[in-house]
């Protein structure tokens, strides 16, 4: 018989850095999920990734207090900041203050990496989403 799902929880955890301190510990603890078991499993699953990369995680927990988790690709802003070599987006995006630039080739690379998490039919649609996010951060798309 299938396990009965008690709920789902969405978190953003840095790769290889899951520990029982806030925000992970309280979020899992109040739902009765074994915190250390999640931390060990998550860190093992992300050991090959760049340490500190933010990973969105969807944790499905069951009534018997067991859980499963699915990892997604890092947020688009992470990839854009990394490609443009900036630390933060513009304080006033769309008002002429550009904080950097990104090429169409870099946009395509990000779109290919994020394709399975995006709601896009093809690579061109995914590239349009990436370009929109870049402009919203104050990045200029060139090339």
Curated annotation (Swiss-Prot):
The keyword Ribosomal protein applies. Keywords: Methylation, Ribonucleoprotein, Ribosomal protein, RNA-binding, rRNA-binding. SMART domains: RL11 (SM00649). Part of the ribosomal stalk of the 50S ribosomal subunit. Interacts with L10 and the large rRNA to form the base of the stalk. L10 forms an elongated spine to which 2 L12 dimers bind in a sequential fashion forming a pentameric L10(L12)2(L12)2 complex. It comes from Agrobacterium fabrum (strain C58 / ATCC 33970). InterPro entries: Ribosomal_uL11, Ribosomal_uL11_bac-typ, Ribosomal_uL11_C, Ribosomal_uL11_C_sf, Ribosomal_uL11_N, Ribosomal_uL11_N_sf. Belongs to the universal ribosomal protein uL11 family. One or more lysine residues are methylated. The keyword Ribosomal protein applies. NCBIfam families: L11_bact (TIGR01632). This is Large ribosomal subunit protein uL11. GO terms for molecular function: large ribosomal subunit rRNA binding; structural constituent of ribosome. GO terms for biological process: translation. GO terms for cellular component: cytosolic large ribosomal subunit. Forms part of the ribosomal stalk which helps the ribosome interact with GTP-bound translation factors. The lineage of its organism: Bacteria, Pseudomonadati, Pseudomonadota, Alphaproteobacteria, Hyphomicrobiales.
């Amino acid at each position: 018989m299938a396990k009965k799902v008690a709920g789902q929880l969405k978190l953003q955890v840095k790769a290889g850095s899951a520990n029982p301190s806030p925000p992970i510990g309280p979020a899992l603890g109040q739902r009765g999920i074994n915190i250390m078991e999640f931390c060990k499993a998550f860190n093992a699953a992300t050991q090959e990734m760049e340490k500190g990369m933010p990973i969105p995680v969807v944790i499905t927990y069951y009534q018997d207090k067991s859980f499963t988790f699915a990892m997604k690709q890092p947020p688009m802003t992470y990839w854009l900041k990394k490609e443009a070599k900036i630390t933060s987006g513009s304080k006033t995006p769309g008002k002429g203050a550009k904080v950097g630039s990104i090429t169409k080739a870099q946009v395509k690379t990000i779109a290919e990496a994020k394709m399975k998490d995006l709601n896009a039919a093809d690579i061109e649609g995914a590239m349009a989403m990436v370009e929109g996010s870049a402009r919203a951060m104050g990045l200029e798309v060139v090339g």
